[in-house]
Design a protein with these regions (language model features):
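RNA-binding accessory domains that recognize and position tRNA/RNA substrates
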Residues: 1-244, 252-266, 272-275, 282, ...
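Nucleotide-activated chemistry modules centered on ATP-dependent adenylation/adenylyltransferase
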Residues: 2-13, 18, 31, 149-150, ...
Length: 469
């Protein structure tokens, strides 16, 4: 799938501090270097649950975890049929993990730089010294005459590390046959080497507190621009202001910016009845922490009424946002203020649609609301560094491996994420699955429409750039 270019990729790395930096100069004064990641380049911190997932995948496959304790790692979502995450450590992409929906499993995709952080205990091959230059420098395949050792666990299609006789990594690739067959071969290709451009990688230990210090000037400048924007927009209208709060990281960052710009303004929360329990708790915690009123609109009844008529929402049939969010908030605004100014946590790096959106706009359905996006040009890393600096109460779901917070059964969720939600929230998912089952039987749909989450796409194809409401 083609990458989406939604803005300049800002990720750099400081080899002195061993941290990501969002400018060409680190807070320590050292020059930084660009990190080559796949667009849109909205990299985010790898939280403990993320690190556990990556390490489990690599340990299951190669017999060794990838992310060492005390090492900062980031994840960058890359375009794929379901979910693929690039893993960034030491200032470069050291590999990726990809979810294979048909097999319901994760696959590791290492790059040679991964060998700076792990030594494979299985699924590796060792080649003759004479074969090293062509494999390392030209990306040549591993041929049978140059094969010295192949780990017995290697099966056709496996990702493998290619090692020199001294144990250093000279490449990575995919096995073209089982180990037994390869050992008996006298000629032919054993491993198809994957060509990856060499990247500078400097391992080192650091913390996110170090990263906040390294980015202090960037965060201050970014915050100051957002505060000025809020003050300017609010100064140009007499409409009462509020903060559209969802319980996610972006709306929390927006809350902080608006509070610094305008003081206390109320939170506007749309309770669809489909939120995670942690999200509802976060709304309460944020309101209490910052002394803000919460004004609520409810869309739960509207969702189930529409479900009975339309079936489940899908990525290419997003009736849910208008039914459960836009129409309820329009009615609430009309009753409470008539018209209002809402500051929202919308960012251009989230989707093509949001990139094309103006920073100040009106929604076609909620015409009595002016929306303004103070953090429109922030990346996810800007947001997280800001929240870390402010010690803000962010939603604990992020620490559990979710990268975006919304309705628990959002059709924009990847199948990989849906599997995690089913496991962690069986009661929520059991009710949803039962509703899907009734619709499936009533319309003569196959069982896999439910079991393989085919309900998420009505037409069978969906443009990934439009996955966000």
């Amino acid at each position: 799938m083609r990458p989406s270019y939604l803005g300049k990729i800002l990720l750099h790395w400081c080899d002195t501090c061993h941290v990501p930096v969002l400018s060409d100069v680190c807070g320590c004064g050292a020059a930084t270097r660009k990190v080559g990641i796949t667009p849109p380049g909205d990299a985010r911190p790898a939280f403990p649950a993320d690190c556990e997932l990556v390490n489990r995948i690599f340990e299951d496959h190669f017999g060794a975890p990838l992310i060492p304790p005390g090492t900062i790692a980031l994840l960058n979502k890359a375009p794929d049929t379901d979910r693929m995450e690039e893993i960034i450590m030491g200032g470069c992409v050291v590999g990726a993990i990809r979810y294979i929906t048909g097999e319901k499993r994760w696959e590791p995709l290492p790059r040679p730089e991964a060998a700076l952080f792990l030594r494979p205990a299985r699924r590796y091959v060792v080649v003759d010294e004479g074969a090293v230059p062509s494999i390392r420098d030209q990306g040549a395949s591993v041929l049978a005459p140059g094969l010295r050792v192949i780990d017995p666990s290697v099966r056709k299609g496996d990702e493998v590390f290619i090692l020199s006789p001294d144990g250093s990594c000279v490449g990575v690739g995919r096995a073209k046959m089982d180990a037994g067959e390869a050992s008996a071969m006298e000629r032919g290709a054993v491993v198809r080497t994957r060509k990856n451009a060499p990247s500078r990688c400097v391992p080192g230990q650091s913390t996110w507190e170090d990263a906040v210090r390294a980015n202090s000037s960037v965060i201050e400048e970014t915050e100051a621009e957002a505060v000025r924007f809020v003050q300017e927009v609010a100064g140009n209208t007499e409409r009462p202001a509020n903060i559209s709060y969802s319980g996610g990281k972006d709306s929390l960052a927006t809350l902080l910016v608006v509070k610094k710009a305008l003081g206390n303004v109320p939170l506007l929360f749309i309770d669809t009845g489909l939120e995670f329990p942690e999200t509802l708790e976060n709304v309460a915690v944020a309101a209490e922490t910052y002394g803000l009123e919460v004004i609520r609109a409810s869309g739960e009844d509207a969702f189930w009424d529409a479900f009975e008529r339309l079936g489940p929402p899908a990525m290419d049939y997003r009736w849910c946002c208008s039914a459960c969010k836009l129409h309820p908030v329009r009615r609430l605004i009309e009753e409470r203020w008539g018209e209002c100014l809402s500051f929202i946590g919308q960012r251009r790096y989230e989707s093509f649609r949001r990139k094309e959106s103006n920073r100040v706009f009106r929604n076609g359905i909620v015409k009595n609301q002016i929306s303004a996006a103070p953090i429109h040009n922030w990346t996810a890393l800007h947001v997280w560094l800001y929240l870390f600096r402010e010690q803000a109460p962010w939603n604990p779901l992020y620490a559990q491996g979710l990268d975006r917070i919304g309705c628990f059964m959002c059709p924009s969720s990847d199948v990989a994420v849906i599997g995690e939600i089913q496991e962690k929230y069986p009661d929520l998912w059991q009710e949803w699955s039962a509703r899907l089952g009734v619709w499936q039987e009533a319309h003569g749909l196959p069982p896999e429409w439910v079991t393989e989450a085919q309900w998420r796409i009505r037409g069978g194809v969906c443009d990934e750039t439009y996955r966000y409401c």
